[in-house]
From Swiss-Prot:
Record lineage: Bacteria, Bacillati, Bacillota, Clostridia, Peptostreptococcales
Organism: Alkaliphilus oremlandii (strain OhILAs) (Clostridium oremlandii (strain OhILAs))
Coiled-coil annotated residue ranges, if any: none
Protein name, entry field: Shikimate dehydrogenase (NADP(+))
Self-association and partners: Homodimer.
Known function: Involved in the biosynthesis of the chorismate, which leads to the biosynthesis of aromatic amino acids. Catalyzes the reversible NADPH linked reduction of 3-dehydroshikimate (DHSA) to yield shikimate (SA).
Annotated catalytic residues: 73 (proton acceptor)
Amino acid sequence: MSYVITDETKLTGIIGRPIKQSFSPKIHNGAFQYLNLNYIYIPFEVVQQDLSKTVEAMKVLKFRGFNVTMPHKREVMNYLDEVSENAKIIGAVNTVVNQNGKLVGHNTDGKGYVQSLEDEGIYVKEKTFVIAGAGGAARSVAVQLALDGAKKITILNRTIDKAHDIAQLIGMSIPNVHIEINCLENKTLAKAVEEADVLINTTSLGMYSMEEESIIGEEKVLPSNLVVSDLIYNPAKTKLLQQAESRGCKTINGLGMLIGQAAIAFELWTEVAMPIDYIKKTLFTR
C-alpha cells in the first residue's frame, strides 16, 4: 500500500536521546499503514536544553501526541498541562496526548506490562511478585502492580537504597499492598521466590551483548509453578528464561510489554485498537 502524507495527516512521534535504537516507529507506522489510518510517527533526537521548546512545538504543530523516552521522561512533566494519576506516582511520563490543545501526560509502561501478563492468562489481583532491579522500568511496573491489586511485591536490588525509594513511594501512595525490599543476591532471591507467583527481571542482565548473564546462579532455586518474566526482548529467550524453562516454569519475554505499552499509546491517539497480532507476526518474526 502506498503511504501518502498530506496536509490532513495526523502527526505523532517520539522524543529522546539517543533515538535510533527505538522500535516505536516500526510498531506505530506499521499499525497505521495496516489500518489505513492517515497518521505518521516520526522519531526526533532531542537534547535536554531543547526539551521545553520541542514540547511547545508539538503543541503549535498540532501533534496528536508523542512518546517520550530517556532521558526526558521526568523533566517533560514540567512542560505538560496535566499528568495522569499513575504517571504522577511513578514520576515519569512516556506518552503525551494532545487533547484540544492541552498536553496530557501518561505512563503506559506499567500498564503495558500488566497487559502482557493478562494476554498470557495471568491476572495481578492478589498475586505475589518478586522484582529484580530498581530502575525506571521496575518503578513503573511495581506501581502499576500495586494499583492493580497485587497482594505483595518484593523488590531486590544490588543497591538497596533504590529499592527503598520505590517501596516508600508505593507505601505513601498505595497503602494496601505489602512491600518488602532486600539486596539482590542468590540467597535472597531464592527465599523470595519460594512463595511467589511471578518473578520479574527488570535488570539488563541477559540482554544483547550480555547473553550469558542471569539474575540467578542455579536454576534449581526456581519453583516449577513460578511464572518467570523478563522485560528483555532482545534476545527473545534470555539465559534466565532458558533456566526457567528447564525447571518447567511458564516464561514471558519483554516483547509483550513493548507492544502493550505502544498499543495503549496508539489507542489514546487514534481511539482505535492497535492490531497487536499483526504487529507481532509481521514485524517481530524472524
